Every structure is written in C-alpha cells, then in structure tokens.
Regions:
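SAM-dependent transferase fold signal centered on methyltransferase-like domains
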Residues: 1-405
Length: 405
C-alpha cells in the first residue's frame, strides 16, 4: 500500500546514502525501509529523465527497473507529433505511464493497459497527481488479451506499444520477434483494430529487418540525444503496402526516403573523395541518428561533401556546411599513420578527444600507444582515406566549430 506517510519518508530521505539508510531501518518503526530505498533509487533515475515527474512530490516509482525502461521527457514529447487533439489512443504496454501521460498532454483520450498490478496502481496515482487522470483510463490487461477481456471497446484512432526488451533474468534482447508482446505476430490484429500503429523498438534494431517484419511501415523515426541513439519509432498505417515509399526521420531536421539512399549509393564514385584533405578544410561527423539510418552516400550527395572512403563514415569539404546533420570541425593538420607520427603525436596533443572510423587501432589502443589524455578542445580522427594512389590511413587533427544537440 502506497501511503502519504510512506511517500513523505521517501521524499525526506531522497538524498540519503541508501545502504546506510537500510542499515538504520530500526530507527524508523512502521516504515518498510527497504521498499523505500527502492522507491528512492527509482526516483533518482528519473531526476534528469523526467524532471517534471521528479519535481512532483506525489509521484511514485514502483521499482528502479520501471524507471530505466520508461521513455524520457524528450522522447515522450516527440511522440506528441502523432497525436491530434480529441483522438483515442490505446497504450497497450502502459508500464510507468510516461507515454500515456504525454499523449494525454497533447489532447488525446488514452486507454492505458498494463498486466502488472503494481504498475497500474502507481499509474493511477501518478496520473492523478500530475493532473491528467481525467484523460486516461487504466485497465489491467495484456496487449494480447485486451479485446477478449473488454470486447466492446470503441475503436481507437491509434495504438501504441513499447514491447519489453528484457528476459525474465533482466538481460536485454534485441530481436523484435523475441520481445513481449510480439508485435510481428500481432501486427494484423493491431491494424484491424486501429488505422495507425506506433511501436517503440530497440535503438540496436536493424532497420531493413524492421521493414521486412513490419511491411505496413510508413515511417521510421530515429531519436537521438547527446549524440546517442535513444529510440526507434515505427509508424504503421493500415493502408500502407509493401511497395510504399518509406521515409526515415533523423533528428534534427534530416529525413529521406529509403530508395534515395539506394540511388545515391549507385553513384558512389562521384561522392567519394580521391585526395587527402588539407588544413583549413572542414571535417564532418554525422550524428547518431544519421549513422543509424545508414544514409551514408545520400548525406554526401545532399550536403555536397566528399566521403573519405566507402567504409569511413566521415566527410570533408573545402567550404563550411552550416546545416550538416552532425558535428563540424576545422582541419588543423593531417598526419600519415605511422609509428614515427604516433610517437611524436603527444608532443602536439598531450590531451585530446580521439575517434576512429575504419582505422587499424581502437581508441583504447591509440591512447595506450601515445599516452594522450582524454578531453580538451582538440579532436583527432583516425580513419582510412581514398586517394589517387590508393587507400591510406591518416590522423586528421581538428578543432570543433559546431555542436548539434
């Protein structure tokens, strides 16, 4: 039972050392201190992820794992673009209720379905204290059995699912068909019940396989924050067919049809550089979403930059490209990769950020051989460059001129 006294205890001790708090449990008769410690751990996990929830004193997090698996404020707000005010949305994998909360915030009426009783109770409480309970109906049910349990439910405008990507022992899984619920098996039922279906899947998933498994896919959205891929969203429509052009959206502001990359790849010779860039030129590193999308040759074509090598996903140009979807750098010097250059590299760069793309050394091996400390304002890229006389390994020394979110 979640009581006001228990919540007060949790919030009072939110900054405490948890092992010490548990050891001092005898000082707090009438309080399940171990349960409180788990709640505190869960709240700490949403402090940066869901600051509005963390700041609301009545919010409860049943277990740390539910906080780890839930959407963030960033991804929750992103999903609001799929919502039209007044529409009915079924969230069939309710969990902590973050996505239901943001759907309701966008003006949707939401049915939250979740098989775990503890999560349903927590969601009811959280929706109430967050001021959205009037827009969300909570039902304890699995996605698979919802319509058997409630056969007269009205037809939703959209169904949302975030299949569990963990096994019973809490280890991660990446195969879409191994997730629960199995959206591959359910896809026909889902599209029969709703004209639009939105599915959140692992950022490790293979996009081409997604399209094969879910042929009604119309759009794929790749969400990244701080240059790390966080989520992939698959948007399906009932009327979509296997021949439909599928658009991939990469944040920020870069989208393309899948066949565009195929056409650009067919023209790869024109997009590959054939020389070593020189100081004063610009180096471009695609953002995490672009890298995940696989739009390697289309990026070169669309932004009029040259690709270092077929397998080196870095680009360069002699002119600045201010809207490049990633990070931009000015090239300060270019060094051939050799034992001699490695030995003297730390003389010029005692501290630097290192990255490798299609390079003989890993970053760890590079640091070990040069003793270059991590950090600073210099960025060194080890990569393979296609030149007029063949492929060569080079170290491109740069300074950053722009940082995309």
């Amino acid at each position: 039972m979640i009581t006001e006294e228990f919540n007060t205890f949790v919030r009072t001790h939110i900054e405490d050392d948890l092992p010490r708090l548990v050891l001092a449990a005898a000082k707090y008769p009438g309080v399940d201190v171990r349960a409180a410690a788990l709640r505190i751990e869960g709240l700490r996990k949403i402090k940066d992820k869901l600051p509005e929830w963390y700041a609301c004193s009545g919010v409860v997090i049943p277990a740390p794992v539910s906080a780890e698996q839930c959407s963030s404020a960033f991804t929750g707000e992103y999903k609001q673009r799929f919502i039209t005010p007044g529409t009915l949305v079924y969230d069939l994998t309710g969990g902590l209720g973050v996505d239901s909360f943001y759907f309701a915030r966008a003006g949707a009426r939401v049915l939250y379905a979740e098989p775990e009783e503890g999560l349903c109770r927590a969601a009811l409480l959280n929706f109430k204290v967050l001021g959205c309970a009037h827009s969300i109906t909570v039902v304890q049910s699995t996605a698979e059995s919802l319509w058997d349990f409630l056969p007269d439910l009205p037809s939703p405008d959209m169904i949302y699912l975030d299949p569990s990507r963990r096994t019973g022992d809490n280890s991660r899984i990446y195969d879409l068909e191994a997730c629960s619920p199995n959206v591959v098996e359910l896809r026909e039922l889902l599209l029969h019940k709703a004209p639009r279906v939105l599915i959140k899947i692992s950022p490790m998933a293979d996009i081409s396989r997604i399209v094969t498994l879910l042929p009604a896919t119309k759009e794929i959205h790749i969400l990244s924050a701080r240059n790390e891929c966080k989520e992939i969203l698959v948007f399906m429509e009932r009327e979509s067919t296997k021949t439909l052009s599928r658009r991939i959206f990469c944040e920020p502001g870069f989208s393309f049809l899948m066949e565009e990359e195929s056409r650009a790849s067919a023209e790869r010779e024109a997009l590959l550089g054939n020389r070593v860039p020189t100081p004063g030129h610009y180096l471009y590193e695609p953002g995490a979403s672009v890298m995940k999308s696989g739009a390697f040759f289309l990026t070169a074509q669309r932004y009029a930059v040259s690709k270092f090598h077929t397998n080196s996903h870095l680009y360069y140009s002699d002119k600045a490209v201010p809207d490049f979807p990633g990070r931009s750098f000015v090239i300060e010097r270019v060094l051939p990769f050799s034992s001699r250059e490695l030995r003297r590299l730390s003389t010029f760069y005692p501290k630097a950020n290192l990255a490798v793309r299609n390079f003989p050394l890993s970053v760890a091996q590079w640091r070990q051989r040069t003793r270059i400390a991590d950090g600073g304002n210099d960025y060194l890229f080890g990569t393979t460059v296609r030149t007029g006389s063949g492929d060569g390994h080079f170290i491109i020394c740069t300074t950053k001129i722009d940082e995309k979110p």
